[in-house]
Design a protein with these regions (language model features):
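Beta-strand-rich binding/interaction modules
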Residues: 241, 323-365, 373-375, 748-749, ...
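Short glycine/proline/serine/threonine-rich loop/turn segments at secondary-structure transition edges
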Residues: 221-224, 264-270, 339, 381-396, ...
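Extended carbohydrate-recognition surfaces in non-catalytic/accessory domains of CAZymes
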Residues: 137-229, 285-293, 716
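The feature marks long extracellular or luminal low-complexity segments
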Residues: 46, 53-57, 295, 374, ...
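Ser/Thr-rich, Pro/Gly/Ala-heavy low-complexity intrinsically disordered linkers and tails
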Residues: 3-6, 17, 29-139
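Active-site mouth of glycoside hydrolases
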Residues: 250-262, 266, 283, 382, ...
Length: 845
């Protein structure tokens, strides 16, 4: 698996067959083909440092790598000069080349490539990317050295509605809206009492949306295999390249990758990728699901012999403070026409970036075809720095694939060294110590952003939970974006990774939910790794394909402690038992290291508590029924249990603490959310429900949040002092600096206060925001659950608070002002600079 932090970086190869690709590829592809840019010289990458005290040969702009043991790595071969970027075929704006980011193990990042200067039919000026600086976290290399991975988020065109012929390359799209992804078009509204999504979907729109992107591929890449990878498209997506259909993916919560090699053109020819997303069959969800290409997109160019999709698995079968064994399996495929003798090398780097001795898997012949060949090796680690909640130490594995002595592909896999067990005596133990899950269950949308959540916003949300004492998240009721798990790894948060909200039976009248696809046969090309033959008897189903996808993608994250096969599944016990048996077997085959549970609702009526379901599951999971849970875990053979969903009643926590086998609980919910509106219009979210979040949608703690903060032993925070007479608008930014990267965002908070600065929580006055400088207001919110647009620059205060969410459009000073009738206005400034956002490590504010 390739870490999502790597996928955000522009990388180039030191090998001849991709020489110069960074200059042309980034200029042509990153600029969205709206520009003509000068290609950078493609120099050889530095050799891998593998000698004690002697680093690898220094690559361009890079520092000498730290030495491990073995022989000094050779210098990468010099590449040829990259040719100039070609003119844009559609005249869309050229965008900035992404900044290079340093390898945190000690190698400086590549320079961002030059953006274009002008599109051939009117594209605006692009900006040169900045030089990479320090890495974002020790021990996590930020860039592949051979495989080319290009961020593909910019330069898209969007049309809301159906568009006949939009799958064809020659389709006229010049009037379409230009934007970048991630993009959630549903959150843009409007709210509508008669929306087909109903109150369960937050009364927001659904339907069909089309995305198109024009790009060119340099001739230097014509010997590679070219893939397009989506982290998530909501929903029922169809992807086309130059008019050829690549595949369909119904489930909007999973990533997928298509091979475009046979259908792309190299050189100056225009390529067009088209994506149709369709959630028009409604209702389709019990909660807000969003719409569109709402997660990141990446374009990958790899040698014909390369590591297969998400094929690297890292586990730690032994892990103590004295020593650990890192066990690695990876699958190499051969897209060529002749068998190749392949060797695989693994280099582990510790959290400080120091490389350990390299380990080699025995050479094997890899035949052409998709089946691939499995390589395994073990890496011994003395005195490892264990991954734990308070010390989230991250190691990394660099896997090099070599043919005839030359490295043709590589893969960087972050991982943590830890031991984790669940049993009926001690519950959950992490590194030999009993740990209780102080958990919350949440949905993936955040405030005015919907489901297209910038990485900074996820970082902010997880930091807010940590302040309340939370140490675990249940991803309700679907897998989250890759960067969410990256942050959980870095911040020491445990994750219960949930698959589905439904199986074969719809919930309520939600005719468009996943039950419509669950048991259907998946096509031969799904965009995911093949389902193991032992599980898929004949054609694989969509549920088998999606679980394979999720587990293979997520299994290397130390934060992921367990999988949940579903939430409150309505299938009858006979159907459910057979399916559950297959699901657990599939999870164990793909990831033997992790346990499997399910969030069961009222299971006592059908015999599950002491019957088949309890026996099949590794860990008993129960929603809202403590007695059933206690019965299930105490019935022989005993097993661990977890309260997968509970309300805010604090009495349950004393039961958790007094029951060793009970691993912990997850409160519903961690934060208010859109959809599942319990009351009538115009309430559009959960906030009026007695089971509201520990915080509102914008992160303001609700009263119960402070209660659980104290119960969980977190340092106390005090609610703001309150006043009675509104006098002024006080404006504050959660961060004084902002990067020109759409993964970064600043929350500008407007507080209605009295003359002494005390918050007037009774105020619901409209707040008007204005902005000057290189910034834009991407949304407004207050935490209110009433139907009120998230777009524009006006928001009614809720509990005396309103927010403007701001992103930078260029470097410089951004000034935001807020005004309200009869009150003194406020001003806040944010300094924006060019750069690439990097995920935090450890305690993040």
């Amino acid at each position: 698996m390739t870490d999502s932090s790597d996928l955000r970086r522009v990388t180039s190869s030191g090998l001849g067959w991709v020489a110069g690709s960074l200059g042309l590829f980034a200029a042509a592809v990153l600029a969205g083909c709206g520009s003509s840019g000068s290609g950078a010289t493609g120099s050889g990458a530095g050799g891998q440092a593998v000698t004690a005290g002697s680093g690898g040969t220094k690559g361009p702009g890079g520092s000498t790598g730290s030495g491990g043991s073995g022989d000094t790595g050779a210098s990468g071969a010099s590449g040829t000069t990259g040719s100039s970027g070609v003119s844009g075929s559609t005249g869309t704006s050229g965008t900035a080349g992404d900044s290079g980011t340093a390898d945190t193990s000690g190698t400086a990042g590549d320079d961002g490539s030059s953006g274009g200067t002008s599109g051939s039919t009117g594209g605006s000026s692009g900006t040169a990317g900045s030089t990479g600086g320090g890495g974002s976290g020790p021990g996590i290399p930020e860039a592949n050295r051979v495989r080319t991975i290009i961020p593909f988020d910019s330069g898209w065109l969007f049309f809301k509605g159906d568009a006949t012929g939009a799958d064809q390359a020659a389709f006229a799209d010049t009037t379409w809206r230009a934007l970048s992804v991630p993009h959630d078009w549903s959150i843009e509204g409007p709210f509508d009492q008669n929306a087909a999504t109903t109150g369960r979907g937050g009364y927001l729109p659904a339907g069909i949306g089309w995305y198109r992107k024009h790009f060119t591929l340099p001739q230097a890449l014509s010997g590679t295999q070219v893939f397009i990878e989506f982290d998530g498209v909501m929903a029922n997506s169809d992807v086309y390249i130059n008019g050829t259909h690549l595949g369909n993916r119904p489930y909007g919560y999973v990533g997928f990758r298509y091979d475009m090699t046979a259908n792309v053109k190299f050189g100056t020819a225009d390529n067009v990728i088209s994506v149709k997303c369709d959630n028009s069959v409604q209702p389709a969800s019990r909660y807000y699901a969003g719409a569109g290409i709402y997660r990141h997109v990446h374009l990958i160019a790899a040698a014909p012999v390369h590591i297969d999709q998400w094929a690297t698995s890292v586990s730690t079968p032994t892990a103590t403070a004295a020593s650990a064994t890192v066990h690695v399996t990876t699958v190499v495929v051969n897209g060529g026409t002749a068998a190749q003798t392949v060797t695989v090398q693994g280099i582990v780097s510790d959290p400080s970036g120091t490389a350990l001795a390299p380990v080699w898997a025995p050479a094997q012949s890899v035949a052409p075809g998709k089946a691939g060949t499995t390589f395994t090796f073990d890496v011994p680690v003395a005195n490892p720095k264990l991954w734990d909640i308070g010390t989230p130490n991250m190691y990394s594995l660099l896997t090099n694939v070599q043919v005839a002595g030359a490295t043709v592909d590589d893969d960087v896999t972050p991982f943590g060294i830890r031991s984790l067990t669940f049993d009926g005596t001690a519950g959950m133990t992490l590194n030999g110590k009993s740990v209780k899950l102080k958990g919350v269950a949440i949905h993936q949308e955040i405030s005015a952003l919907g489901v297209a959540v910038p990485e900074r916003a996820w970082q902010r949300r997880l930091a807010e939970f940590k302040v309340l004492g939370v140490n675990a998240i249940r991803t309700s009721h679907n897998p989250f974006a890759p960067e969410f798990l990256d942050l959980a790894d870095r911040m020491g948060i445990l994750v219960l990774d949930e698959f589905f909200d439904v199986w074969t039976q719809h919930k309520y009248t939600d005719v468009g939910d996943y039950a419509a696809y669950f048991s259907k046969a998946a096509p031969a090309i799904t965009g995911s790794p093949a389902v193991p033959a032992a599980i898929a008897a004949g054609a694989a189903t969509w549920w088998q394909t999606d679980i394979t996808d999720i587990v293979m993608h997520d299994r290397n994250h130390p934060s992921v402690i367990m999988y949940s096969t579903g939430n409150e599944i309505r299938d009858n016990i006979n159907t459910r038992s057979a399916l559950l048996t297959q699901m657990v077997a599939l999870c164990h085959q793909l990831d033997p290291a992790r346990s499997v549970t399910q969030a069961l609702f009222d299971p006592g009526t059908n015999g599950d508590v002491t019957g088949a379901t309890r026996t099949i599951l590794d860990v008993w999971g129960n929603n809202y029924n403590v007695p059933n849970c206690l019965t299930a875990i105490s019935t022989a053979p005993k097993r661990a249990g977890v309260l997968t969903e509970m309300g805010h009643e604090t009495s349950t926590w004393s039961t958790v603490m007094s029951t060793p086998a009970l691993a912990g609980e997850f409160i519903w919910s961690g934060a208010d959310y859109l959809g599942e509106a319990p009351l009538m219009w115009p309430v559009v979210g959960s906030g009026s429900n007695p089971l509201l979040g520990l915080m509102d949608r914008v992160g303001t703690p609700n009263p119960d949040g402070y209660t659980w903060q104290k119960l969980w032993g977190a340092p106390a925070t005090t609610p703001p002092a309150t006043g009675t007479t509104a006098s002024q608008v006080t404006l504050t930014a959660d961060h004084a600096t902002l990067l020109t990267d759409l993964n970064d965002i600043s929350y500008i908070k407007a507080s209605i206060t009295d003359a002494s600065g005390k918050l007037v929580t009774s105020s619901a006055t409209p707040v008007t925001f204005s902005i000057t400088g290189p910034g834009t207001i991407v949304g407004v919110d207050s935490g209110s659950q009433m139907a009120e647009t998230f777009r524009g620059n006006v928001r009614n205060a809720f509990n005396g608070i309103a927010f403007a969410l701001v992103q930078a459009t260029g470097p410089g000073t951004i000034t935001v002002k807020a005004s309200a009738t009869g009150l003194t206005g406020g001003t806040a400034t944010v300094q924006a600079s060019a750069g690439t956002f990097a995920l935090c490590s450890g305690t993040c504010d």
